[in-house]
Each structure stands twice: as C-alpha cells, then as structure tokens.
C-alpha cells in the first residue's frame, strides 16, 4: 500500500520535541520549535470505554492524547468514557463535526448502536486510530477487524523488545530511527497482515515472553497504517503500560499516526 504523506507532519514532530519532554524514556534528536497551531484544528473522539479488561494506563492515554492536541495545535479532543457516552457519541449525529475516532485501549464489544454506520463513516473519508487493545475489541465483528487490519490472539510476559522500523518516511515511524527499544506487553495476532497494510513496526523474532515460541524467528506486526475506503487507519500494538504512554518517542509515534489519519 502506498502511503500518502503530507509535509506538515514534520512540524508536528518538532513541536512535540518542544512540548512533551519526558524523563521516562529515550528522546529523539533535533531542535525545538514553538507551537504553531493550524488555522482550524481537527476534532478527534477518544473512546476509552471497556467491556472487558480495563488497562490502568487509560487515564494516562487520555491525558497524553489531549496534551498532544493542545500543544501541537493540530486537534482538539473529545473524551468518550462510558457506555452511555458510546451510545450517544458513536452515531451519525454524534460524529457530526468529528474528523477521527481513537480507540485507546478499548476492550470487548462496545455498545455502539450501529457499528456498520461507524465503519461507513470511516470509509467515507474519516480517520481511525487504535492503540494496543483496540485489537482486543469486537472479536465478534469481522467488519471491524477487517477495518483495523488484524485481531489480537495472545500475549506473554511483559518484555523488552527492539522493534524494527520498517518505514522511515511515515510520520508515525520516522521519529523512531531504525529500531525502537521498549518494555511493554507484546501482542501476537491471528494472522500475518503484510499484504493489506503499510507495515511500520515489526519484530523478526518472537519475544522472550515465556510462550512456547519465545526466542524463535518470526514475523510479528507491531504497528501499521492502511486505507479503509477513502478513510485512513493507524494501529499500534504498543501502549499497555503507563510508562510507555509517558515515553517521548512513543508520543511522537502516536502523534504521527493521528496526524496521518487526519490527512494533515
């Protein structure tokens, strides 16, 4: 799949190095830029409701995504936290004026009144970004999983990995160098999805996570971008831990993905 990149992503990466300094993880090199808000910030709906396991990192995820929008000036954030929020906001009426949906560590089958309508909304040219357990959401909805690009299968112990950066020009992966070292819960998926996505991060060996295939050669996707009709989709399997969400490089990874799905 050919990525459609816009030059504006480089500005956001520079802004982030200025605004989201952090002592919990490695930093990207380069100078700093004062924030230059866009003339009309986009609007994203960040969904954190869960119908299954609930990650302790969700409040940090909400805080981080909100801050990325505020400090870059690229987007404003609307939080969708409860079942009643989902039923009200994830509708054609609720999505009026929204440019992208984010599933930040959602789990289970959310009480969306008409999931098909939401998927058509994305297909019509809007954006979708999923973090970590967005792939552990809607196991009973093949159309959602097709839109996302894969389905969570299992994970082992949390472990340090060095993710291979496969695309040096995509805004979600270009700030990460050639490898991204991170300690997190590493997901494994039901299938290989290289044929239908632009792969951004991967592993060429199963992590030493205590599972039977630990340490063996493999091809494990970690982050990708894809189209869905005229819409754009970004997914990263990283983001289980609170300290990952505080990692300055992970923030650039997320911001680049959001800017790409917003077509900025």
Q: What are the residue ranges of the model-derived segments?
A:
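Helical hinge/lid and interdomain linker segments adjacent to catalytic or ligand-binding clefts
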Residues: 30, 34-35, 43-47, 52-137
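A glycine-rich, often tryptophan-bearing local segment used as a flexible ligand/cofactor-contacting loop or short
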Residues: 103, 107-178
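C-terminal motif of bacterial Sec signal peptides marking the signal peptidase cleavage site
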Residues: 17-19
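Short, solvent-exposed loop/turn segments at secondary-structure junctions
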Residues: 51-52, 108, 135-137, 204-207, ...
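Bacterial lipoprotein signal-peptidase II cleavage site
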Residues: 21-28
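Extracellular ligand-binding/catalytic regions of CAZymes and related secreted enzymes
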Residues: 28-41, 56-59, 63-72, 81-82, ...
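Catalytic beta-strand/loop cores that center a nucleophilic Ser/Cys/Thr
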Residues: 97, 150, 155-229
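Bacterial N-terminal signal peptides that target proteins for export
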Residues: 1-9
């Amino acid at each position: 799949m050919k990525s459609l990149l816009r030059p504006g992503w480089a500005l956001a990466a520079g802004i982030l190095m200025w605004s989201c300094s952090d002592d919990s993880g490695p930093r990207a090199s380069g100078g700093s830029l004062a924030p230059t808000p866009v003339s009309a910030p986009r609007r994203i709906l960040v969904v954190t409701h869960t119908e299954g396991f609930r990650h302790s990192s969700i409040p940090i995820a909400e805080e981080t995504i909100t801050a990325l929008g505020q400090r870059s000036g690229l987007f404003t954030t609307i939080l969708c936290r409860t079942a009643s929020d989902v039923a009200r906001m994830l509708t054609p009426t609720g999505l009026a004026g929204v440019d992208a949906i984010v599933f930040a560590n959602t789990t289970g089958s959310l009480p969306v009144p008409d999931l098909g309508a939401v998927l058509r909304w994305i297909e019509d040219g809007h954006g979708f970004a999923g973090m970590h357990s967005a792939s552990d959401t809607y196991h009973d909805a093949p159309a959602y999983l097709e839109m996302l690009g894969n389905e969570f299968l299992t994970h082992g112990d949390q472990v340090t990995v060095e993710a291979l950066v496969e695309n040096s020009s995509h805004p979600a992966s270009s700030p990460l160098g050639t490898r991204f070292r991170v300690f997190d819960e590493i997901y494994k998926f039901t299938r290989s999805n290289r044929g239908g996505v632009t792969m951004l991060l991967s592993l060429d060996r199963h992590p030493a996570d205590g599972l039977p295939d630990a340490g063996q050669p493999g091809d494990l996707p970690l982050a990708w971008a894809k189209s869905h009709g005229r819409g754009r989709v970004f997914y990263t399997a990283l983001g289980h831990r609170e300290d990952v969400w505080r990692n300055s490089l992970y923030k650039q990874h997320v911001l680049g993905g959001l800017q790409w799905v917003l077509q900025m």
